[in-house]
Amino acid sequence: MTVFLRLFFISLICLLPAAHSFSVENTAASFVGADVCAGCHADQYSLWKGSHHDWAMQAATQQSVLGDFNQVSFEHYGERTEFYRQGQDYYIKTQNAEGKMQAFKVAYTFGFYPLQQYLIPFPDGRMQALGVAWDSRPKAEGGQRWFHLYPDEA
């Protein structure tokens, strides 16, 4: 009987409201930058800096963009994609979801070698890479050209 009473009282205690309430502050995470990491992880940082992982995703700048954006175009199954610059900004003009030509500002590069893609921001907050990418290999190896990631698909 004493075991039953103990279990009964323990069950009742579990049903009582907690005496203390804890509040958890919801703070949004933000990117602090790689240099902050270097302060505590100098060896790992020196191995990472300049590697393909370092270059994996960069803001679209003259230093990071490898593709030819000098008013060139690429056509795949009748769909034309144009690459150009306006000042310091990089643009890709291609068909939008409605099938109409639209210019999209490139926000980021994605990848480095042997290919580089370009990320386009959309109004809903997504970043989208297009089906056309830049082959960053040397020309002698068949690179330095635009190509479609899915060559057999329209």
Where are these regions (language model features)?
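Short Fe-S-cluster ligation motifs
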Residues: 64-86
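Positively charged n-region of N-terminal signal peptides that target proteins for export
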Residues: 1-7
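Extended surface/linker regions that mediate inter-domain or inter-protein docking
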Residues: 86-154
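Short beta-strand-initiation
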Residues: 8-9, 69, 76-78, 113-115, ...
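Sequence context surrounding c-type heme c attachment/ligation sites in exported
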Residues: 22-70, 127, 131-154
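Ala/Thr-enriched low-complexity intrinsically disordered regions
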Residues: 2, 18-19
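Short secondary-structure capping/turn segments at boundaries of alpha-helices and beta-strands
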Residues: 26-27, 70, 79-81, 105, ...
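Bacterial N-terminal signal peptides
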Residues: 7-18
